Every structure is written in C-alpha cells, then in structure tokens.
C-alpha cells in the first residue's frame, strides 16, 4: 500500500462531524474529483476515486449529513495495474441540483446557472471548517510521495482560481504551499518535510504523521553518520597526504645535503617522521624529550618542507 493510500485510509475514518464540517469536506471532494453531466434524465454528478476508503466516506457523508442515497459503482481500470475504479453517482432525483448549490459548485448569476470555481468564504469560517476542507481536498485530489525517497505533498486541481483559494486556506495554518501549472492542471504543493508533517496534523492523519517523523529521524541520523564518515575520511586523506609529502621532503634533504646539516630541533623531527611515517603529529611530539605539542611539530615540519622546496628550486 502506498503512503498516500495509508493517509487517505486514516483520514477517511472521520465521519462523526457537524453538518458545517461535513459540508466543507464534501464540497472540497466534489470540487477536485467530480464531474457534472447533463442528459435527458437531467443533471447528474459523479465522483471518481481509486481508493475504496474514499468512496465509502463520500457515500456515508452524503447519506448521513445530506440524506442523499447515492449510487456506488465499481469498474476495472484500463491501466496496466488493473485497479478498481470507484464512482459515486448522484442523479437529479436524488437531489443533486440542491447539493451542487449548497456546496457552492453551482451559483446563479442573473438567474442563470453557472459553475463557481472559487471557494465560498461562508464554508471556511472556522478553523475546524478549514481543516475539514483541506482534508476533503486531499481525499479528492491529494497525494504524498514515499517519504523514504523524497518529501512531496500535492493537491491536483483543474482551476487556477480554485488552486489559489485552496493554497490560501492551507497557508492560514502558517504553511508555505505554492501553486504551479502542470499541463492543464494546477498543483498546490509542499516540499519541506516539517511542513508536510504539519499538514498531516491539520487533516488529522496522526498515525501517518508519526510514521513520517520516524522516517525523517532515521534519514537525518543516516545523513549525519554519512557526513561524519565523509569528514573523517577527508581528514584522514589529508593527514596521509601531508605525511607522504613530509617524508618526500625529508628524503630530498637527506639526499641533497644530509640531515646533519639541519638544526637539531628540525633534525629530530625529520628522523622521527622517517622512522614513524604513519604516526600523528601529536604522537610524534610525545616521542621527543622534552615533549612538543602538535602545533610545534607542525611548525617544524613546515620549516623542513620550506628547506626542501628551496633545494628543489635551487634557491
């Protein structure tokens, strides 16, 4: 089961709500996943989903809060996956016309019936109304990627005006959702893991939220370990390269003028480095009597490398 299906399965359990919240939720579902049809038998409305939990919720909300006994149909998808497609159909005799006006999908302008692509403010007056509306929009047209791979949550809509309205509702909770166009669709999306967690909390997907948080923590731990390993590997490589360079410089001095020509403090360090090429600067310093700190050893080796460079260039 995909992570999106888990989230929808969880939030579709919310059926015990007041009429105002039910109206906000069913309106959002209908706006993003429904189609209107006109035929000889009148007006009809169809909502389509691949998620059985979503279909059950739509059927239940219509029955319990609007006294509409809709028709639930199932057919096989034409896609390679051959998933079931669930359709909830409301016909003229079931009260579809009244429902379309009540949910704000239809409106009269100068006595003429028109489609309304905006979200009615009266439907989202309270915080709970807005939570229900966002939940409905996710049930009808939302998806979330597998958080093991990437963080991405989106709502697919078919109207720019509607997408902007929905984005504004989401952002009243302090989020930073954005709208982009993808072919003929308008997408509201969130890409930051922390903000996706907040949105799951808003719509009541608490179990999914905890699962995502656990994944985020594990990913962060793995990333921190990888960064630490990379840092240690880089430091080790740097140390090894420095030791090789120091040994090469000391051998050059040895071959050109002999180490006995070096001042005693430099000669001692040069001989130690030749005899212990794998030891750290700190360990080399501890071998001297009296002991010398890491910075002191580093300073002497830099002087040795400078002498070698002068011999190499003939200065």
Curated annotation (Swiss-Prot):
<dbReference type="InterPro" id="IPR003802">
    <property type="entry name" value="Sporulation_regulator_WhiA"/>
</dbReference>
<dbReference type="InterPro" id="IPR039518">
    <property type="entry name" value="WhiA_LAGLIDADG_dom"/>
</dbReference>
<dbReference type="Pfam" id="PF10298">
    <property type="entry name" value="WhiA_N"/>
</dbReference>
<protein>
    <recommendedName>
        <fullName>Probable cell division protein WhiA</fullName>
    </recommendedName>
</protein>
<dbReference type="GO" id="GO:0043937">
    <property type="term" value="P:regulation of sporulation"/>
</dbReference>
<keyword id="KW-0238">DNA-binding</keyword>
<dbReference type="Pfam" id="PF02650">
    <property type="entry name" value="HTH_WhiA"/>
</dbReference>
<dbReference type="GO" id="GO:0004519">
    <property type="term" value="F:endonuclease activity"/>
</dbReference>
<keyword id="KW-0132">Cell division</keyword>
<dbReference type="Pfam" id="PF14527">
    <property type="entry name" value="LAGLIDADG_WhiA"/>
</dbReference>
<dbReference type="GO" id="GO:0003677">
    <property type="term" value="F:DNA binding"/>
</dbReference>
<dbReference type="InterPro" id="IPR018478">
    <property type="entry name" value="Sporu_reg_WhiA_N_dom"/>
</dbReference>
<dbReference type="InterPro" id="IPR023054">
    <property type="entry name" value="Sporulation_regulator_WhiA_C"/>
</dbReference>
<feature type="DNA-binding region" description="H-T-H motif">
    <location>
        <begin position="280"/>
        <end position="313"/>
    </location>
</feature>
<dbReference type="InterPro" id="IPR004042">
    <property type="entry name" value="Intein_endonuc_central"/>
</dbReference>
<comment type="similarity">
    <text>Belongs to the WhiA family.</text>
</comment>
<dbReference type="InterPro" id="IPR027434">
    <property type="entry name" value="Homing_endonucl"/>
</dbReference>
<dbReference type="GO" id="GO:0051301">
    <property type="term" value="P:cell division"/>
</dbReference>
<comment type="function">
    <text>Involved in cell division and chromosome segregation.</text>
</comment>
<keyword id="KW-0131">Cell cycle</keyword>
């Amino acid at each position: 089961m995909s992570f999106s299906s888990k989230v929808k399965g969880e939030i579709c359990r919310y059926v015990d709500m007041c009429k105002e919240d039910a109206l906000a939720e069913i309106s959002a579902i209908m706006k993003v996943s429904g189609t209107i049809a006109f035929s000889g038998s009148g007006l009809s409305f169809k909502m389509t989903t691949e998620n059985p939990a979503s279909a059950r919720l739509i059927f239940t909300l219509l029955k319990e809060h609007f006294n509409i006994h809709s028709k639930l149909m199932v057919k096989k998808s034409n896609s390679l996956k051959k998933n079931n497609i669930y359709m909830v159909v409301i016909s003229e005799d079931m009260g579809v016309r009244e429902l379309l006006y009540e949910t704000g999908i239809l409106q009269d302008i100068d006595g003429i019936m028109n489609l309304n692509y905006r979200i009615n403010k009266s439907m989202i007056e309270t915080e709970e109304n807005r939570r229900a509306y966002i939940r409905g929009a996710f049930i009808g047209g939302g998806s979330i990627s597998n958080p093991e791979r990437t963080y991405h949550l989106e709502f697919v809509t078919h109207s720019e005006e509607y997408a902007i309205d929905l984005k504004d509702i989401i952002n009243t909770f302090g989020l930073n959702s954005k709208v982009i166009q993808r072919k003929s669709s308008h997408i509201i999306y969130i890409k930051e893991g922390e903000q996706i967690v907040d949105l799951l909390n808003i719509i009541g997907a608490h179990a999914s939220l905890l699962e995502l948080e656990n994944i985020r923590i594990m990913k962060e731990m793995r990333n921190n370990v990888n960064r630490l390993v990379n840092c240690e590997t880089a430091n080790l490589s740097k140390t090894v390269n420095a030791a090789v360079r120091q040994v090469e410089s000391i051998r050059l001095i040895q071959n050109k003028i002999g180490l006995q020509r070096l001042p005693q403090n430099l000669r001692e360090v040069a001989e130690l480095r030749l005899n212990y090429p794998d030891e750290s600067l700190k360990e080399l310093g501890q071998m001297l009597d009296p002991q010398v700190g890491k910075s002191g050893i580093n300073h002497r080796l830099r002087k040795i490398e400078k002498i070698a460079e002068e011999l190499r260039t003939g200065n």
